[in-house]
């Protein structure tokens, strides 16, 4: 497998519960390396822009409200097969369906407060990384 980069987000429901370190440790223990990280408080405009792909979905308003309710940690992760590896360690979107030992099984409160987001493909990883980081902020 090739070394690749992916985007990872620790959502407000997790940062409010002081889980940033625990979640980052799970990612690093899975073999991923943090090459960029910053804590942001998303504006409504940023949340709507980042999640624009979901704008016509019934949960969009609730998603934007949740993402603007507290600080978020946005990160770029690097490693062999980073996109798939991150998806695996995050677990299923619905924590009730997530595998034991995954971030969502361990830390998520509900499907709406599922603690993390991660890119699902190389194209979305590139877009999501570019949304939050300049090239000079990524130090690998």
From Swiss-Prot:
Coiled coil: none annotated. It comes from the Bacteria. SMART domains: NDK (SM00562). It is found in: Cytoplasm. Its EC number is 2.7.4.6. One of its GO terms (cellular component) is cytoplasm. One of its GO terms (molecular function) is ATP binding. Disulfide bonds: none annotated. The keyword Thylakoid does not apply. HAMAP family: NDP_kinase. Homotetramer. This is Nucleoside diphosphate kinase. It comes from Rhizobium etli (strain ATCC 51251 / DSM 11541 / JCM 21823 / NBRC 15573 / CFN 42).
């Amino acid at each position: 497998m090739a070394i690749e980069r992916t985007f990872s987000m620790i959502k407000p429901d997790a940062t409010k519960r002081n889980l940033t370190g625990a979640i980052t440790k799970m990612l690093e223990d899975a073999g991923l390396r943090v090459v960029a990280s910053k804590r942001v408080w998303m504006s409504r405009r940023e949340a709507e822009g980042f999640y624009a792909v979901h704008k016509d979905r019934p949960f969009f308003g609730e998603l934007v409200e949740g993402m603007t309710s507290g600080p978020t940690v946005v990160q770029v992760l690097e490693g062999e097969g980073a996109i798939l590896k991150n998806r695996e360690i995050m677990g299923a979107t619905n924590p009730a369906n997530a595998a034991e030992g995954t971030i969502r099984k361990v830390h998520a409160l509900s499907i709406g407060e599922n603690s993390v987001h991660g890119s699902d493909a190389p194209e979305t990883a590139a877009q999501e990384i570019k949304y939050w980081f300049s090239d000079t902020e990524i130090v690998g």
